[in-house]
């Protein structure tokens, strides 16, 4: 039988247990028609790239399926009728990778990693509290840890 991967996005208002119920229904429907679910991953509640049916977030689920094309069309019909499913996409694949997919592999990485120096800070206020104006010479000031020795020498001369 051909192999398929199906990614479905469920509404953010439903709970994870309800998302599991949707995935269980798909699994039961595929297995009742002599198919098999080889892989099932819950990617979590994620931001959508754009609004879908007035939703900005959705629960993502990946299913790896081994089923006949008629079974897949019936599964897609059932997903289309379910009001809790915002979108789904099923593609045919050569093989189903047993390793965790990319979103799950990235989950272990630190999302708030240091992005490095991003340029000088725009001028805000002087230490005295007076706001910086257009007539002030110092438009930008670098953080102390990024200032070079040359900058420090110029500041000492002034």
Curated annotation (Swiss-Prot):
CDD domains: bS6 (cd00473)
Segments of skewed composition (Basic and acidic residues): 106-117, 127-150
Keyword Mitochondrion: no
Region (Disordered): 98-158
GO CC, alphabetical: cytosolic small ribosomal subunit
PANTHER family, alphabetized: MITOCHONDRIAL 28S RIBOSOMAL PROTEIN S6, SMALL RIBOSOMAL SUBUNIT PROTEIN BS6M
Protein family membership: Belongs to the bacterial ribosomal protein bS6 family.
Protein name, per record: Small ribosomal subunit protein bS6
Domain of life of the native organism: Bacteria
Alphabetized GO MF terms: small ribosomal subunit rRNA binding; structural constituent of ribosome
Keyword rRNA-binding found: yes
Keywords noted in UniProt: Ribonucleoprotein, Ribosomal protein, RNA-binding, rRNA-binding
Annotated source species: Acidiphilium cryptum (strain JF-5)
